[in-house]
Amino acid sequence: MNASSVVQPLLTRGMKAVLVSQFFSAFADNALLFAILAQLKAQFYPDWSQPILQIVFVLAYILLAPFVGQIADRFPKDRVMLFANSFKLLGAFTICLGYDPFLGYALVGVGAASYSPAKYGILVELTDGDRLVKANGLMEASTIIAILTGSVVGGFLSDWNLAIALLVCALMYGIAVVANFFIPRLSAVRRDKGWNLKKMLTDFASACCILWHNKGARFSLIGTSLFWGAGITLRFLLVLWVPVVLGISDNSTPTILNVMVAVGIIIGAGAAARFITLKTVHRCMPAGVLIGVMVVIFAVQHSIWASYVLLIILGIFGGLFIVPLNALLQESGRQTIGVGYAIAVQNLGENIAMLLMLGLYSLVIKIGVPVVTTGIGFGTLLALTITSLWIWNRFQRN
C-alpha cells in the first residue's frame, strides 16, 4: 500500500461536505417540484401545463450552458456551489411569498444550472482514477436518496399543508448553503480565462465540437441525454398514470412510485461502482435497453404492488446505465477541455433531450392520447433508440 492511498481516502472531509450539500439541495429540488405540482392542481391548471413547469426549469440550463462550465473552472468550485444553492433558496422564497410558481421555479433552475458542473467537477479535484467511478456512485446514491426522501416528503406535506411544504423546501436549501461552508477552499482550475461574451460562446461551441469528435464522450453524451430526458418524462407520466389506472388522486402516491425508481437506482449505482470500470463501461448498454422494456411492462399493468416491483427493477437498470456514462464523460473532459466545460456540454445535451421529450409529451397529452398508450409508445421508442445507440457505438469502435 502506498502513502497516497493512506492520506487520500475516498471519503475525505471535503467529499463528505459535498455529499451533504448535494443531498439537501437535491432533496429540496424534488420536494419543491411535487409541492408546485400540487399547487398547480389546487389552482386547476390544465394537465398539459405540468411538463411546462419543468420546461421553464430546463430552459435555464440551455440558456446558461455556454457560461456555467467556464464559471465552474474559472472560480473555486466550492464557492460556485455556494452561490448556486443561494440562488435556489431565492427561488424557493419567491414561491413561498406567493409569486408566480413558474417564475420561482425558473430562478431555481438558474441555480441548478450553475450548480451541476461544479458538483461533478469537484469530484475530479477530490479523487482520481477508478475511484472516480466510486465517487460518482456515492454522488448518484446521495442524489437518489435525496430524491427518495424529498419526493415523499414533498408529496405528503402537500397533501397536509401546501404552505408548510414550500417552507420546508426553502429550509432544505438553507441547510445546503450552510453545508457548502464546510467544503475546503479549492483553487480555480482555469483562472486565466477571460469574460468576453463572444469568445465564451465561441469557446463553448468549440468545446461541444471537441467532445463530439471524441468517441467516448460522444457515446456518453447521447446516452446520458436519453436517460435524463426519459427519466423526467417518466416522472410526469406517473403523475397522470396513477389517477387514471389506479384510481388514486392524492399527491403522495406518484411520489412513492418515483421513490421506487430511486431505490432501484441506488442499487444499480452501487452495482455499477462495484462491477464496471472505465475500461468496461460498455457493459451498461443492455441495462439501458431494458429501461424502455420495463416502461412498457409497467404501463400495461394495473396493480400498485406490481408497480412497486417493476419500478425498482427499472431503477436498477437506470443506475447501471447512468453511473459509468457519467464517469466516462468526466474522464474524457479531464483529458480534453476540462471537467467543468464537459459537464456544461453534458447538461446542454441532457436538457435539450428533456425539452424535446417534455414538449412532445405535453403535446401528446394536450391532443388527448390516453396515458397508457403514451406510456407504451414512450417505452418502445426509448428501447429502440438505446438499441440503435448500442449498435452504432459497436460499429464506431470496430
From Swiss-Prot:
GO terms for cellular component: plasma membrane. The keyword Methyltransferase does not apply. The keyword Transmembrane helix applies. CDD domains: MFS_MefA_like (cd06173). InterPro entries: LysoPLipid__transptr_LplT, MFS, MFS_trans_sf. The chain crosses the membrane at residues 17-37, 52-72, 90-110, 137-157, 163-183, 226-246, 256-276, 285-305, 309-329, 352-372, 373-393. SUPFAM superfamilies: MFS general substrate transporter. Keywords: Cell inner membrane, Cell membrane, Lipid transport, Membrane, Transmembrane, Transmembrane helix, Transport. It comes from the Bacteria. It holds the Pfam family MFS_1. Its main location: membrane. One of its GO terms (molecular function) is lysophospholipid:sodium symporter activity. It is a multi-pass membrane protein. It is found in: Cell inner membrane. Disulfide bonds: none annotated. Catalyzes the facilitated diffusion of 2-acyl-glycero-3-phosphoethanolamine (2-acyl-GPE) into the cell. Belongs to the major facilitator superfamily. LplT (TC 2.A.1.42) family. This is Lysophospholipid transporter LplT. It comes from Photorhabdus laumondii subsp. laumondii (strain DSM 15139 / CIP 105565 / TT01). The lineage of its organism: Bacteria, Pseudomonadati, Pseudomonadota, Gammaproteobacteria, Enterobacterales.
